[in-house]
């Protein structure tokens, strides 16, 4: 499998950093996946979504999660996020404090593909 950068230069990452009620971690993940993989997820319908998000669980604190995804336009993401909030997905009930708001970061450095391709050849 070819190496690829985690994100493309000039795009944006949304990074949600939140905690889940420790008594409901498995239920949170199940409900999140049901919503995320369902046909009603408005995020998956946008051309501005470059790479689908990944839900990441902290190995040091299993109640802490990050949701990270790549977008070409964070204003589009912010507008769609308002729609998502109005939908009141069931997984939100397990987010401590109910706050599910991302920070946005611009990708200012990403390894060029030709360098990754050369590195891959040396691994083989």
Q: Where in the sequence are the language-model features?
A:
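Non-catalytic surface loops within mature trypsin-like serine protease
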Residues: 20-22, 73, 109
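A short, glycine/Asx- and small/polar-enriched loop/turn
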Residues: 61-65
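Short, surface-exposed ligand-recognition loops at beta-strand->loop->(often short) alpha-helix junctions
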Residues: 19-34
């Amino acid at each position: 499998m070819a190496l690829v950068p985690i994100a493309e230069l000039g795009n944006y990452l949304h990074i949600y950093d939140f905690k889940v009620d420790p008594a409901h971690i498995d239920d949170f993940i199940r409900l999140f996946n049901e919503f995320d993989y369902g046909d009603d997820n408005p995020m998956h319908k946008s051309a501005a979504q470059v790479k689908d998000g990944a839900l990441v669980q902290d190995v040091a604190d299993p109640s802490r999660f990050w949701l990270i995804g790549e977008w070409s336009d964070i204003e589009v993401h912010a507008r769609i996020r308002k729609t998502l909030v109005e939908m009141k997905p069931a997984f939100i009930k397990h987010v401590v404090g109910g706050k599910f708001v991302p920070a946005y970061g611009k990708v200012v450095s990403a390894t060029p593909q030709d360098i990754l391709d050369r590195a891959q050849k040396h691994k083989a």
